[in-house]
């Protein structure tokens, strides 16, 4: 397979984990933000997580630096544009980007300005490249809950016009879904689709809860359903798609090694699985790298890849018109 030339879909990609290191330097200079160095190699070293982190929390420390310069409308628009540009250049045809609007208020932007800026950057890239996209709004679980509905309300103005879904992100504690039932219900009432980070860090019950309590149609990661029979069966019977991110899962110790990643077993058992980057910069990856890794480690043929691509299309939070256009790339 020519991994670079194959059409690709990425349904799980974080904006703040996919910023170009040079852009952090450029924006720090423009905004007069203090950063540790203006050397691009130094900045990249601070943004890329080690190949093996002790845990997810250590991995998440890599986001503070890019977030520090993502506090203006111009910065958010630029970073959004550049992410879609980078993806388009490796034949990603559809990209769903998630980000937490709550993290971008240090310069007093309101949520509508924040969301509008990233959508504007995406639209600029769509006009320039052969790529389509949408945004997912991630609620950061370690932050106060008092403005969650404000995020949902602001995003609702862009629903099906750049914004499509609601997500819960950040470190994963057992039973977290119970605290977010009213917010997921509110998002559903507004018309959001639901995808939830769950089952990344060894808690299969969280996947069961995300589907049964929060209405999740897709699960971010979800790999630890392999140790929770009820969650596994629910994912299978309800046809819930798993957004797997192989490189990231190895880095965060969600799995010990790529060889022990359950992706291949899930695929061969008929689960809906997709291949995604998670964080292009923090994990120092691309969709091309992820596809090659998955193909080589899980013995995927080109026919397997096209089946997985089709699963990604079927489970994308986009219009039937866009889905039909994406399927034409594998006709």
Curated annotation (Swiss-Prot):
Keywords in alphabetical order: Hydrolase, Metal-binding, Nucleotide metabolism, Zinc
Species the sequence originates in: Shewanella pealeana (strain ATCC 700345 / ANG-SQ1)
Entry GO MF terms: 2'-deoxyadenosine deaminase activity; adenosine deaminase activity; zinc ion binding
Domain of life: Bacteria
Physiological role: Catalyzes the hydrolytic deamination of adenosine and 2-deoxyadenosine.
GO BP: any one term: adenosine catabolic process
InterPro entries for this protein: A_deaminase, A_deaminase_dom, Ado/ade_deaminase, Metal_Hydrolase
Known catalytic reactions: adenosine + H2O + H(+) = inosine + NH4(+); 2'-deoxyadenosine + H2O + H(+) = 2'-deoxyinosine + NH4(+)
Gene: add
Record: residues binding Zn(2+): 12, 14, 197, 278
EC number of this enzyme: 3.5.4.4
Cofactor annotation comment: Binds 1 zinc ion per subunit.
Family per record: Belongs to the metallo-dependent hydrolases superfamily. Adenosine and AMP deaminases family. Adenosine deaminase subfamily.
Active site: 200
Cofactor(s) needed: Zn(2+)
This protein's name: Adenosine deaminase
Enzyme kind, highest EC tier: hydrolase
């Amino acid at each position: 397979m020519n991994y670079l030339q194959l059409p690709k879909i990425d349904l799980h990609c974080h904006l703040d984990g996919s910023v170009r290191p040079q852009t952090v330097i450029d924006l720090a200079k423009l905004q007069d933000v203090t950063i540790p160095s203006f050397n691009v190699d130094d900045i990249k070293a601070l943004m890329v997580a080690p190949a093996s982190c002790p845990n997810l929390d250590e991995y998440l420390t890599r986001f503070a630096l890019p977030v520090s310069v993502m506090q203006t409308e111009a910065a958010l628009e630029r970073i959004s544009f550049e992410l879609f540009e980078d993806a388009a250049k490796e034949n990603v045809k559809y990209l769903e980007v998630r980000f937490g609007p709550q993290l971008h208020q240090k310069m007093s932007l309101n949520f509508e300005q924040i969301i509008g800026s990233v959508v504007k950057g995406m639209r600029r890239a769509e006009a320039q490249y052969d790529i389509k996209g949408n945004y997912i709004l991630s609620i950061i679980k370690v932050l106060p809950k008092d403005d969650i509905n404000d995020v949902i309300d602001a995003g609702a103005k862009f629903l099906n016009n750049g914004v499509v879904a609601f997500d819960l992100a950040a470190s994963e504690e057992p039973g977290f879904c119970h605290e977010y039932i009213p917010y997921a219900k509110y998002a559903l009432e507004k018309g959001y689709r639901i995808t939830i980070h769950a089952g990344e860090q060894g808690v299969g019950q969280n996947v069961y809860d995300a589907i049964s309590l929060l209405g999740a149609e897709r699960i971010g990661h979800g790999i630890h359903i392999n140790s929770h029979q009820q969650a596994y069966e629910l994912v299978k019977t309800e046809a819930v798609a798993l957004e797997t991110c192989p490189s990231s899962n190895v880095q965060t110790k969600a799995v010990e090694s790529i060889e022990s990643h359950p992706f291949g077993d899930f695929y061969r058992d008929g689960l809906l699985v997709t291949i995604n980057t998670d964080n292009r910069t923090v994990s120092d990856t691309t969709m091309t790298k992820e596809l090659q890794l998955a193909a080589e480690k899980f013995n995927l043929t080109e026919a397997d890849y096209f089946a997985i691509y089709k699963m990604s299309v079927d489970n994308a939070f986009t219009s039937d018109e866009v889905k039909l256009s994406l399927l034409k790339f594998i006709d």
